[in-house]
From Swiss-Prot:
K(+) binds at residue 129. Keywords: ATP-binding, Coenzyme A biosynthesis, Cytoplasm, Kinase, Metal-binding, Nucleotide-binding, Potassium, Transferase. This is Type III pantothenate kinase. It comes from Cereibacter sphaeroides (strain ATCC 17023 / DSM 158 / JCM 6121 / CCUG 31486 / LMG 2827 / NBRC 12203 / NCIMB 8253 / ATH 2.4.1.) (Rhodobacter sphaeroides). One of its GO terms (cellular component) is cytoplasm.
C-alpha cells in the first residue's frame, strides 16, 4: 500500500491508498521537532484503532516545511522499508514541467494540486487552495503550471488582526447573516468572510482577463466549502485534491521506471 503525506505549514495529513481508494486519512499538527519514532507510534495507534491492516511498502511526500522532510524520510526508511518519493526533489518527475521563470521555486503542494486538477478537470484551470496561505494556481491547456497568486490565508488574517490590535478578540470564521455587524465579533467575521469572497472574485476575474479565457475554477482546502455557499465561485470543490495529486505523481514516476 501507498502512504501519501502532505506536510503543510499548519497540519500534516497522512493517507493510506490501496491502489483504488483511500482507506483512511488522518491529520496532525505540523511540528519539525516530531521524530520518526513519534510519527510511527501515532500512525500505528490509528491503524490499530481503525482495524486497517495496511502493509505500507511505498510512500510519497509533499512538504512546504523543509525541516520536516528528514524525519518523514526516516519514518519511511526505518519502519516501512521504502524510499519515499519527495515532490520537488530532482528524482521526482512531473507529467508536465512548470512554465515559470527560470530559477523559480514553486511550492510542492501547488504543483501537486495542479497535477490533480488537470487530471480531473482538464486544462485552462484555476485551482484555489484555502490553506495557511490562500493560493491561486493556473494551469494552461497542456496541463502545465504557469504561475499564480499567493494571498494571506483566512485564519492567518484573523490571527494577525488579533495580534496587531489588542482590543480585537480572536474569532472563528463563519458565514455571517449580513454584512453589517452589530458587535465586534460579527464585524470581524463579516470583514474576513465578505473580504475573501471579494478577493476570490476579483483575482479570478483578473486571471480570466489576462488569459482571455473563461477558465474553470476548482477549490480545495478545509475552508473551501465555507466559501462555496451559493456564490457560484467554483465549478467544483475537491476535498482531497492534494492527496489525489500525490497518488498520480507517484504512479507517473513508477511508470517511468
Amino acid at each position: 500500500m501507498l502512504l501519501a503525506i502532505d506536510c503543510g505549514n499548519t497540519n500534516t495529513v497522512f493517507s493510506i491508498w490501496d491502489g483504488t481508494q483511500f482507506l483512511a486519512t488522518w491529520r496532525i499538527a505540523t511540528d519539525h521537532k516530531r521524530t520518526a519514532d513519534e510519527y510511527h507510534v501515532w500512525l500505528s495507534t490509528l491503524l490499530s484503532l481503525t482495524k486497517i491492516e495496511a502493509r505500507i511498502s511505498e510512500a510519497v511526500i509533499s512538504s512546504t516545511v523543509p525541516r520536516v522532510v528528514f524525519n518523514l524520510r526516516v519514518l519511511c526508511n526505518r519502519y516501512y522499508d521504502c524510499r519515499p518519493l519527495v515532490v520537488g526533489k530532482p528524482e521526482c518527475r512531473l507529467p508536465v514541467a512548470p512554465r515559470v521563470d527560470q530559477g523559480t521555486t514553486v511550492g510542492p503542494d501547488r504543483l501537486v494540486n495542479t497535477v490533480a486538477g488537470f487530471h480531473l478537470h482538464g486544462g485552462n484551470l484555476i485551482v484555489v487552495d484555502f490553506g495557511t496561505a490562500t493560493t491561486f494556481d493556473v494551469v494552461d491547456a497542456d496541463g502545465a503550471y504557469i504561475g499564480g497568486v499567493i494571498a494571506p490565508g483566512v485564519n492567518l488574517s484573523l490571527e494577525a488582526l488579533h495580534m496587531a490590535a489588542a482590543a480585537l478578540p480572536h474569532v472563528d470564521v463563519t458565514k455571517p447573516q449580513q454584512a453589517i455587524g452589530t458587535n465586534t465579533v460579527a464585524c470581524i467575521q463579516s470583514g474576513v468572510y465578505w473580504g475573501y469572497i471579494g478577493l476570490v472574485e476579483g483575482i479570478v476575474r483578473q486571471i480570466r482577463l489576462e488569459r482571455d479565457s473563461p477558465m474553470k475554477v476548482i477549490a480545495t482546502g478545509g475552508l473551501a466549502p465555507l466559501f462555496d455557499q451559493g456564490f457560484n465561485l467554483f465549478d467544483r470543490v475537491e476535498d482531497d485534491l492534494t492527496m489525489q495529486g500525490l497518488v498520480l505523481i507517484h504512479q507517473y514516476n513508477k511508470d517511468l521506471e
